[in-house]
C-alpha cells in the first residue's frame, strides 16, 4: 500500500532562486488582489509599519499571503510539470 502512495506523489522541486521569484511574484499579486477586493482591509490588529504594508491589518495581510502561497504552489507545480524548473 505504501508503494502505491509513493507512485502518486508528485516529484518535488528543489528550492532555487527561480522558484523563490515565482513565489514572491505570486504573493505580490495576491496582496494586490486583496488590497483591491477586501472590503475593510484595516480592521483588526495593525501591522508594525502600516505605510509599508499599504494600511492593511494583520488579518488581511495573513489572508493575502496565505492566498499567495496557494497561488505560488500551483504555479511552481505547474511550471515544474511543464519542465521550466
Swiss-Prot record:
Keywords: Membrane, Photosynthesis, Photosystem I, Thylakoid, Transmembrane, Transmembrane helix. One of its GO terms (cellular component) is photosystem I. It is a multi-pass membrane protein. InterPro entries: PSI_centre_PsaK_sf (IPR035982), PSI_PsaG/PsaK (IPR000549), PSI_PsaK (IPR017492), PSI_PsaK_bact (IPR037101). Its main location: membrane. It holds the Pfam family PSI_PSAK. It is found in: Cellular thylakoid membrane. The chain crosses the membrane at residues 13-33, 59-79. One of its GO terms (biological process) is photosynthesis. The keyword rRNA-binding does not apply. It comes from the Bacteria. Belongs to the PsaG/PsaK family. This is Photosystem I reaction center subunit PsaK. It comes from Synechococcus sp. (strain WH7803).
Amino acid at each position: 500500500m505504501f508503494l502505491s502512495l509513493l507512485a502518486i506523489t508528485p516529484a518535488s522541486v528543489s528550492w532555487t532562486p527561480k522558484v523563490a521569484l515565482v513565489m514572491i511574484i505570486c504573493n505580490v499579486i495576491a496582496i494586490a488582489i486583496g488590497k483591491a477586493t477586501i472590503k475593510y482591509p484595516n480592521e483588526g490588529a495593525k501591522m508594525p509599519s502600516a505605510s509599508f504594508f499599504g494600511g492593511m491589518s494583520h488579518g488581511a495581510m495573513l489572508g493575502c499571503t496565505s492566498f499567495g502561497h496557494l497561488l505560488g504552489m500551483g504555479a511552481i507545480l505547474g511550471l515544474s510539470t511543464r519542465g521550466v524548473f
